[in-house]
Swiss-Prot record:
One of its GO terms (biological process) is diterpenoid biosynthetic process. Binds 3 Mg(2+) or Mn(2+) ions per subunit. The Asp-Asp-Xaa-Xaa-Asp/Glu (DDXXD/E) motif is important for the catalytic activity, presumably through binding to Mg(2+). The lineage of its organism: Eukaryota, Viridiplantae, Streptophyta, Embryophyta, Tracheophyta. Its EC number is 4.2.3.48. GO terms for molecular function: magnesium ion binding; terpene synthase activity. Mg(2+) 2 binds at D332, D336. Belongs to the terpene synthase family. Tpsg subfamily. This is (3S,6E)-nerolidol synthase 2, chloroplastic/mitochondrial.
Length: 578
């Protein structure tokens, strides 16, 4: 059995009998957007629809037609993993395109961590054939998979599909499969790649046009590609759709689906156990009782960790990462809900000093929060030092100080009733989003490739962090700007932009914001390409954070989050039928 399989099951334990339970009513009551003050910071810590620590979680019970022990499931699952691993190697050796299709399927099901070595080997060989085909699907699929894996493939591989005028050939409109692959590939574009911009417009237009004459099944597949391109979506969320829409035409796909179903159920149980650990830590910390104004939603905080760190082997890391995320929410509540401006200034000064004696002049509730933050940060630093031989305390302190400084800037804006310039707002909003705090802690908790150079770069907020943070800030601001009848200054980028561009409509401001999100994605895509000073795990986590954002901030007309509700139901509530 492969080592990756053993490592996966090393962290898997059946859910305890006393595990809490999520009910449908609990999910329903958490779908409304929080009413915000007129100038409200929005970021990681904005309220959404996840439950409180008292919300129970239904225990997972893996069942088939015949009752089997977990040991039986483990053995059979590992056998199937090894079988598919051999099939993947053999098929890719004989048929390059089919090998690419297999990798694509593995990634869409979100279980590529099992086959990383095989994928590495196959894609490395594929670099010599980047444009050796006149099939649009094959060229586009190879381009996307290689770029996702860090290989720089030039955009001119698509020149063979252009006419003498330099535009994509209209005859490609008959190749729906190729157009979908081209659209997917265009999502990997970086700044200045005009061919990929054209590819997205060309393929997107023809695919939308095709919806009217395709049968229901194929129209559903095309529509899903347009709404949820793979590169910008969470595989764990879209995998269920892959099961429904993909019809098996060969034996390897049936085998892969079987492997994925078992994986989903086991990972679901693992996530439930992690939530139990987080809930226990939060309860023992006692802040929910001490600070009545603060949110009490450990499951909500955990969802970020679950989305960012998808490899089951990273169970301990997900639990540890949720702890600083909880303090982002807690401190956000202090700045938003409870603190006076004078108290917030004192609290920010205390965090910048990072001395326990700094709490002497704070009100009691701030003393409690600062002491808990101080202890939690020192505890994480000790764990990182013991496990990885590096003391991250200085970097962690910098991240908390930066967050509080940004929160304070926005508190002063709110107190003055004045809107800042849009650029100033976004620059500060990137920090106050909380993304920097989360990814800095994640880097050290993962403990991979910690060097003086990488730490110095991390402390300077690299593009990997700033782009993810900007995407979060702008996505959230799009949601807050939907209501043109809002009173006052809601502090969104859209409102700031409207304020300084007289005559600009809200539709134009929203279009500007959407284009900025696209530009930030291009910057983030550049960070995926080699050489990258950060390990692949942290880069993927940053990417997954950006993928999670639409689920967290896509409000419907009732100011609800249906996509996030569905994600939570799939990941923690529903089993996959065996």
């Amino acid at each position: 059995m492969a080592s990756s399989s053993r490592a996966f099951f090393k962290v898997f334990n059946p859910a305890p009998k006393s595990i809490p339970r999520i009910g449908q009513s609990n999910l329903m009551q958490l779908t409304h957007k929080k009413q915000l003050p007129t100038f409200q910071r929005r970021g990681i810590a904005e309220d959404s629809l996840l439950p409180s620590s008292t919300t129970p979680i239904k225990p997972m019970n893996v069942e088939t037609k015949h009752t089997r022990t977990m040991g039986d499931i483990f053995v059979q699952h590992c056998q199937k993993l090894e079988l598919f691993r051999n099939v993947l190697r053999n098929v890719a050796e004989l048929d390059a395109l089919e090998g690419l299709n297999m990798i694509d399927a593995v990634q869409r099901l979100g279980i590529d961590f099992h086959f990383q070595r095989e994928i590495d080997e196959i894609l490395h060989k594929q670099m010599s054939n980047v444009s050796a085909s006149d099939d649009l699907h094959e060229v586009a699929l190879r381009f996307r998979l290689l770029r996702q894996h860090g290989y720089f493939v030039p955009e001119d591989v698509f020149n063979n599909f252009k006419d003498s005028k330099g535009t994509f050939k209209q005859v490609l409109g008959e190749d729906i499969k190729g157009l979908m692959s081209l659209y997917e590939a265009s999502q990997l574009g970086t700044e200045g790649e005009d061919t990929l911009v054209e590819a997205e417009k060309f393929s997107g237009h023809l695919l939308k046009t095709s919806l009217s004459h395709l049968d229901h099944h194929h129209a559903r597949i095309v529509g899903n590609t347009l709404r949820n391109p793979h590169h910008k979506s969470l595989a764990s969320f879209m995998a269920r759709n892959f099961f429904v829409t993909t019809q098996a035409t060969n034996s390897w796909l049936n085998l892969l689906k079987d492997v994925a179903k078992t994986d989903f159920n086991m990972v679901r149980s693992l996530h439930q156990n992690e939530i139990v650990q987080i809930s226990k830590w939060w309860k023992e910390l006692g802040l929910a009782k001490e600070l009545k104004f603060a949110r009490d939603q450990p499951q909500k905080w955990y969802i970020w960790s679950m989305a960012c760190l998808t490899d089951p082997k990273l169970s301990e890391e997900r639990v540890e990462l949720t702890k600083p995320i909880s303090f982002v929410y807690l401190i956000d509540d202090i700045f938003d809900v409870y603190g006076t401006l004078d108290d917030l200034i004192l609290f920010t000064e205390a965090v910048n000093r990072w001395e326990i004696t700094a709490i002497d002049h704070l009100p009691d509730y701030m003393k409690i929060c600062f002491k808990a933050l101080y202890d939690m940060t020192n505890e994480i630093s000790c764990k990182v030092y013991q496990k990885h031989g590096w003391n991250p305390l200085q970097s962690l302190k910098i991240s908390w100080a930066s967050l509080c400084n940004a929160f304070l800037v926005e508190a002063k804006w709110f107190a003055s009733g004045q809107l800042p310039k849009s650029k100033e707002y976004l620059k500060n909003g990137i920090v106050s989003s909380g993304v920097n705090v989360v990814l800095v802690h994640m880097f050290f908790i993962l403990g991979q490739n910690i060097t003086t150079k990488s730490v110095e770069l991390l402390n300077e907020t690299p593009a990997m962090i700033s782009s993810s943070a900007a995407i979060l800030r702008l996505w959230d601001d799009l949601g807050s700007a939907k209501d043109e009848n809002q009173d006052g200054n809601d502090g969104s980028y859209v409102r700031c932009y409207l304020e300084e561009h007289e005559g600009c409509s809200i539709e134009e401001a929203r279009e500007k914001t959407i284009n900025m999100i696209s530009d930030e994605w291009k910057k983030l895509n550049r960070e995926l390409l080699s050489p990258n000073p950060f390990p692949a795990t942290i880069t993927l986590a940053s990417l997954n954070l950006a993928r999670m954002i639409p689920l967290m901030y896509s409000y419907d007309g009732n100011q609800c989050l249906p996509s996030l509700k569905e994600y939570m139901k799939l990941m923690l509530y529903e089993t996959v039928s065996m």
